[in-house]
Amino acid sequence: MKMTRRAFVKANAAASAAAVAGVTLPASATNLIVSSDQTKIKWDKAPCRFCGTGCSVLVGTQNGRVVATQGDPEAPVNKGLNCIKGYFLSKIMYGKDRVQTPMLRMKDGQYNKDGDFAPVSWDVALDTMAEKWKAALKKHGPTGVGMFGSGQWTVMEGYAAVKLMKAGFRSNNIDPNARHCMASAVGAFMRTFGIDEPMGCYDDFENADSFVLWGSNMAEMHPVLWTRISDRRLSHPHVKVNVLSTYYHRSFELADKGYIFEPQSDLAIANFIANYIIQNNAVNWDFVNKHTNFKQATTDIGYGLRDDDPIQMEAANPNSGAMSSISFEEYKKSVAPYTAQKASEMSGVSEEDLITLAKQYADPKTKVMSLWTMGMNQHTRGVWMNSLVYNIHLLTGKIATPGNSPFSLTGQPSACGTAREVGTFSHRLPADMVVANPKHRAISEKIWKLPEGTLNGKPGAHAVVQDRMLKDGKINAYWVMCNNNMQAGPNINTERLPGYRNPENFIVCSDPYPTATAQAADLILPTAMWVEKEGAYGNAERRTQAWYQQVQAKGEAKSDLWQIMEFSKRFKVEEVWGEELVAKAPEYRGKTMYDILFKNGQVDAFPLSEAQELNDDAKAQGFYVQKGLFEEYASFGRGHGHDLAPYDTYHTVRGLRWPVVDGKETLWRFKEGSDPYAKKGSDWDFYGKPDGKALIISAPYEAPPEVPNDEFDMWLCTGRVLEHWHTGTMTRRVPELYKAVPDALCYIHPADAKKRNLRRGDEVLISNKRGEVRVRVETRGRNRPPEGLVFVPFFDARILINKLILDATDPLSKQTDFKKCPVKITKIA
């Protein structure tokens, strides 16, 4: 091949530069650009789009496109590291099937439930939506509409959604997909401490002597945090790592001791540890006497099923969250049956191993960090299980000090910052307030400038009940934003899909890709992703982080915030509030919901000139909307233990952990000297409770609603893998991640495979009375279940494994148990 001298010099320069970077280029690569002016990449910070760890990344943009990402070396969370998903963030927005225009089901030029998707304008899309919402409101009132949101919403998007639904439509039928992942953690925080979110922080990783993972595969689900545990373990020989799970996974590789237990028996193990602490005189009496009270939970509370379900009808106290005061002696008596022998019989873990674990909690010189995610939260007694672990830490006083931390890890980037802190749950308001409390409603109405009585005091429909109401025709207009619940939620065939396809209902899905949810909807709205908009997230350690918009969205895609605000412009106050309420605020007569909720002198208080040049949402509204929403929202928590810094501050730092008082973040809550809200002289102050005392709550073992039988003889557990996130909407569109793990597999014990004449790679039918899926078996690899259990991840849209999951919930948190249901495995010839 001939090459000119100019071409040779150019190629040689490129090859020399590549060699320095450790990359080999072909000598004929003459099309490479070597001018720095043409290759300059602009870098800016943003929190990662995936899990709740809250890693900060540097985002590289060029020519209006994200071209690279890297770990942020200035970030205290990840210290320059990323997991495999984080390294490919630059590709999540550029899938070939990105939805770029609204798509409405149509036939003969008109909307038709049975029609095919066709592109329409934003005006047609939103006008059609508004027509359907008005019809549902007229037919059913505020309960006739609903919204299912996300722990991936930005703080501002979630806050705007809460205002639209609870203040605008006066409907509490809004819930986030965090109901599926964090509701049990929230429930236990509120019951035990009277205030939500962890008291510890990530600094605990560098201070603990023992780590105990309760139903958490951190090696794959929180890999950056796992590196901190690994570093602590490998750098300090005395440190121990304990992993409890119903099956072997990658976190066991570092563990000093692994504990495989029978599904649901974690309740017995936790009660045994409490009993061991008492029997071995390891109670920290000074702490317990000064800082705790004892309660007994109501038992036999059912499983959150439909009222006419035979399993639910057997419960003596269905859905009861009542507690009664008890003495320490009564508490001692309640855990006494959970001996090492009894707990071993129930769990399958040896007595010796159980005692090994209990000793680490009981030793006053050992700082213990307990960590958990879905194994504990996705549990029909998840609130109880969370509380039982708090009991252990409270009995020993191992709480809210460096290295002593019961720590609930979150799975989504803003499950804390948006779902929990903003209050996008059907029963909550911002800053831990609830709709059922008249004082909380009054505070919210005052901040939002609403007439008295606007907010509805009855909690709305949570995630599972929303499905049932759609199926029953009680919710007729429904908006799904920033999640893929048709794939992620339970009992798809029986409850959810019939509701989506109910002819009475109009379903809207806002998403960047044609997910299973989008394909089951009637209208798809194309959504801006991640750095295509400005926003803020809140991570698992209470760290709030903000970012600027860095590129424009593809096609006609708009942010969820823009969609919510534009939709609100289509409703006059008289159409949604009714004459009686409008009469209390005659100045609002004739105004739109947009005028009342978002042009209220607070949200629109900051001029467009304060925003960055690239801020499509601010330009659309004519004011700095993100700052206005954030500052109005922050007013709920300031002075009430949820203090946030001024919005602009978050653009100059790598996040701050609330409460932020006088510019200083809080590392350990409830501890005098660390938490500004802890009273002087208190030592510990659990100020979420009126008397400043946390609760030690007695709760027994109770069986799951279904167990294996002769026909359905195997346990099924669902979950995630390292390479994919949730339903794979983003990660399956990254070629490298898709190629690494293209298909979900059924991980099965070799003995169970042999019984069924199965070999690795064989296709099987996994079935129960709710449905069936086809999947290939894997007898080796990262996940190794014990005999009697199979594990199947839920990222694969071709294998909707969650259709097999019963929509049973923890009756207190309303969170579904995705970790245990009976199935049978049949070989496909």
From Swiss-Prot:
CDD domains: MopB_CT_Nitrate-R-NapA-like (cd02791), MopB_Nitrate-R-NapA-like (cd02754). Residues 1-29 form the signal peptide. Substrate binds at residue 794. It is an enzyme of class 1 (oxidoreductase). Binds 1 [4Fe-4S] cluster. It catalyses: 2 Fe(II)-[cytochrome] + nitrate + 2 H(+) = 2 Fe(III)-[cytochrome] + nitrite + H2O. Its cofactor is [4Fe-4S] cluster; Mo-bis(molybdopterin guanine dinucleotide). Keywords: 4Fe-4S, Electron transport, Iron, Iron-sulfur, Metal-binding, Molybdenum, Nitrate assimilation, Oxidoreductase, Periplasm, Signal, Transport. GO terms for cellular component: membrane; nitrate reductase complex; periplasmic space. Belongs to the prokaryotic molybdopterin-containing oxidoreductase family. NasA/NapA/NarB subfamily. This is Periplasmic nitrate reductase.
